[in-house]
Amino acid sequence: ATHFTHWFQPLTGVTAEKHDSFISPAPDGRVIMEFSGKELIKGEPDASSFPSGGLRATFEARGYTAWDPTSYAFIKGNTLCIPTAFCSYGGEALDKKTPLLRSMQALNKQAMRILKLFGNEDVKCVRTSVGPEQEYFLVDKEMYEKRKDLKFTGRTLFGAKPPKGQEMDDHYFGVIKPRVAEYMADLNEELWKLGILAKTEHNEVAPAQHELAPIYSTTNIATDHNQITMEIMQKVAAKHGLVCLLHEKPFAGVNGSG
């Protein structure tokens, strides 16, 4: 890796990152590659253009990223990605990770209290786990380019009803088409490289709808992995001349993605 980034999840619905190189100037005019503990623990991205839910005025632009040591760092290309929380100067949460970590902490505290009331004095910690299934649609890129509603909104806004509705049960768990199987194989390989344990894949109910299910893991790690998964799904689809639609209801009259 030549760069690092504090990888965080602002209130935009997607992840954010700013890449900094490991290059630092040496006293003799040369450069060295180094990475300090300060750079690992904290970053200061400009937060003025991120949504804040009305917590602060735009001119109060300073935001901080803080390392989340409970989630694994990963390498994407030539960049070391460090999962972080994102907060304002006053400590208000500006992301989706901070409330999640706080809720996990609160649940741990109250669950331990209840367990000890029932006489379990040996418990040290209560951890929650999640295994989010990711449903998605695959559309041929040439067909996708002809639909401006799909390009701009990620879903269709007009069109005729499908010839069949909920009767399309023959697609559910059906034989996976070769082109889709190749996509799934490449997707699995890319996910496994990053330590994301993709386990199950199959056709879903609607035409061109499919599902990927990972092995359960700790809640905040599973959430980070799901964000990475959605990003990689779209990148791998492009390599196969496909477009991966992650909108929960891209087509009227057929099943959406749950």
Enumerate the predicted regions with their spans.
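Active-site core of metal-dependent hydrolases
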Residues: 1-62
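A cross-family glycoside hydrolase active-site/sugar-binding cleft signature
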Residues: 5-7, 34-35, 213-215, 245-247
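Active-site-proximal loop/turn and secondary-structure-junction residues that shape catalytic pockets
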Residues: 8-12, 38-39, 86, 142, ...
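Short secondary-structure boundary/hinge segments and terminal tails
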Residues: 14-15, 43, 208-209, 254-255
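Flexible, active-site-adjacent loop/turn segments at secondary-structure boundaries
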Residues: 20-21, 156, 249
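Glycine-rich, acidic/polar active-site loops that bind/position phosphate-bearing ligands
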Residues: 62-246, 255-258
